[in-house]
C-alpha cells in the first residue's frame, strides 16, 4: 500500500492491508466487499488506489458500497432471512436500484423483487414507479400503495394512451404481472376487453396559421378613381379604419378598395387613397410611360417639401408633380408609393420548343 497510515487514524496500515487482501481474494459475500470498500474509502484511500491493489473497479466499488447500505437498511427493517439470503446470492445490482426509496419502501420493494425474481432493469423500473406513486396526492382508484400496484398503474396509464396494438398488449401483460390487488388486476383486465372496441376517431389538426410579418397582411386602400380625375373625387373618398389584430375593415362608402402589401410607406400613411394612372403622368423618368400604375397618396400630408411628389389641384383635374419650390396650386396629398403591376408570365411558353437564331 502506498497510502500513508498517518492520514488514516481509524484503520491502521496492517488493517488496511488485510482489507485489501480480503478484497483481492473476494472473501465473504458482496455485502462484506461493500463494507470493506467503504471502510477504506472513509479512511482516505482513493477508489483508484483500491482498484490497483484489489482489482475492484471504481464502478464495482460504488455498486457494492451502495447495495450493502441498502442491504443493511433491510436488516434494520427486520426482513425475513429468506429474503436476505436471496440477495446475498448475489443480487447487489438489484438492491442498488432500490437506493432511491426510503427504508420502509425498500423493504416492501425488496420482497416484491424477490418474489418475482426481478433483474436489475426491472427492479429499477419498479423502484421508480413506486417512488413516483408516493408523490401522488391520492391513490388512483382501484390501486393500493404497493410497489406492484404502482408499476401496474404505470402500465395501465400508458396502455390507455397507446393505439399500437402490440405495444398496448405488451403493457397489459406487464401490468397483470405486477398487479398486487384484485382491483388493480381488474382495472387492467378491463383494458383487454377494450382491445376489440373500435377506437374513437381523433379530431383532425386545426389548420392554424400565424401572421409573422406585417407584409403578409395587406392593407385595404380606398380607390378614388382613374386619371383624368377631379379634385372632388379625391376629397370625397371615405377613409378606412382597420381594427387590429386582423385588420378588420367596415366600409360604408361607395366605390372600390384595393389591397396593398403593408410596406413601411403604407404602414405610416394616415389617410391613404389609391389612384390609377399611366406611369408617364407620375414622372417622365419612369420607363414604359403607358403602363398603368397604382399611386397611393396620403391626404394627411399636405406640407410641401422638395423630396416628395404631390397630388395637386389643377382646377378641373388633379396632377402628380414634383416641385422644386413650393407650388401655388393646392396640395391635395403626398405621394407615398407607386406600385407597378406584377409581370404576367405565360406558362404556355414552357411547353413550346426553344427557338434560336441561326
From Swiss-Prot:
Segments for region (N-terminal alpha-helix): 11-194
Assembly mode: Homodimer. Forms an RbcL(8)-Raf1(8) complex. Forms complexes of many stoichiometries with RbcL with and without RbcS. RbcX and Raf1 can bind simultaneously to RbcL. Interacts with both RuBisCO subunits (ccbL, ccbS), GroEL, DnaK and alpha and beta phycocyanin (cpcA, cpcB) in pull-down experiments with tagged protein. C-terminally tagged Raf1 does not interact with either RuBisCO subunit, suggesting its C-terminus is involved in binding.
Phylogenetic placement of the source organism: Bacteria, Bacillati, Cyanobacteriota, Cyanophyceae, Synechococcales
Family in the record: Belongs to the RAF family.
Role, per record: A major RuBisCO chaperone. Acts after GroEL-GroES chaperonin to fold and/or assemble the large subunit of RuBisCO (ccbL, rbcL). Cooperates with RbcX in RbcL folding, plays the major role in assembly of dimers into RbcL(8)-Raf1(8) intermediate complexes. RbcS replaces Raf1, leading to holoenzyme formation.
Gene Ontology biological process terms in this record: carbon fixation; photosynthesis; ribulose bisphosphate carboxylase complex assembly
Region entry C-terminal beta-sheet, spans: 218-344
Keywords linked to the UniProt accession: Carbon dioxide fixation, Chaperone, Cytoplasm, Photosynthesis
InterPro entries membership: RAF1, Raf1_C, Raf1_cyn, Raf1_HTH, Raf1_N
The protein's name: RuBisCO accumulation factor 1
Organism: Synechocystis sp. (strain ATCC 27184 / PCC 6803 / Kazusa)
Amino acid at each position: 500500500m502506498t497510502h500513508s497510515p498517518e492520514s488514516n487514524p481509524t484503520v491502521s496500515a496492517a488493517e488496511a492491508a488485510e482489507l485489501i487482501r480480503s478484497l483481492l481474494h473476494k472473501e465473504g459475500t458482496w455485502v462484506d466487499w461493500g463494507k470493506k470498500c467503504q471502510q477504506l474509502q472513509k479512511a482516505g484511500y482513493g477508489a483508484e488506489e483500491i482498484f490497483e491493489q484489489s482489482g475492484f473497479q471504481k464502478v464495482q466499488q460504488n455498486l457494492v458500497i451502495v447495495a450493502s447500505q441498502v442491504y443493511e437498511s433491510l436488516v434494520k427493517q427486520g426482513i425475513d432471512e429468506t429474503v436476505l439470503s436471496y440477495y446475498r446470492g448475489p443480487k447487489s445490482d438489484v438492491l442498488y436500484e432500490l437506493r432511491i426509496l426510503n427504508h420502509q419502501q425498500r423493504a416492501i420493494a425488496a420482497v416484491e423483487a424477490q418474489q418475482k425474481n426481478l433483474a436489475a432493469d426491472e427492479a429499477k423500473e419498479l423502484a421508480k414507479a413506486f417512488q413516483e406513486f408516493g408523490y401522488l396526492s391520492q391513490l388512483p382508484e382501484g390501486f393500493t400503495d404497493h410497489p406492484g400496484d404502482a408499476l401496474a398503474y404505470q402500465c395501465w396509464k400508458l396502455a390507455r394512451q397507446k393505439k399500437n396494438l402490440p405495444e398496448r398488449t405488451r403493457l397489459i401483460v406487464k401490468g397483470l404481472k405486477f398487479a398486487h390487488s384484485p382491483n388493480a388486476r381488474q382495472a387492467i383486465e378491463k383494458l383487454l376487453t377494450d382491445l376489440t372496441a373500435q377506437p374513437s376517431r381523433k379530431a383532425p389538426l386545426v389548420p392554424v396559421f400565424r401572421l409573422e410579418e406585417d407584409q403578409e397582411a395587406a392593407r385595404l386602400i380606398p380607390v378614388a378613381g382613374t386619371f383624368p380625375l377631379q379634385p372632388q373625387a379625391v376629397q370625397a373618398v371615405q377613409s378606412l379604419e382597420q381594427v387590429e389584430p386582423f385588420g378588420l375593415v367596415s366600409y360604408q362608402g361607395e366605390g372600390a378598395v384595393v389591397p396593398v402589401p403593408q410596406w413601411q410607406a403604407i404602414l405610416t400613411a394616415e389617410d391613404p387613397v389609391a389612384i390609377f394612372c399611366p406611369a408617364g403622368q407620375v414622372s417622365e423618368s419612369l420607363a414604359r410611360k403607358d403602363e398603368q400604375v397604382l399611386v397611393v397618396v396620403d391626404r394627411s400630408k399636405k406640407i410641401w417639401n422638395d423630396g416628395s411628389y404631390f397630388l395637386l389641384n389643377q382646377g378641373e383635374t388633379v396632377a402628380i408633380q414634383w416641385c422644386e419650390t413650393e407650388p401655388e396650386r393646392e396640395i391635395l396629398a403626398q405621394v407615398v408609393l407607386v406600385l407597378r403591376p406584377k409581370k404576367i408570365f405565360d406558362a404556355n411558353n414552357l411547353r413550346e420548343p426553344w427557338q434560336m437564331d441561326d
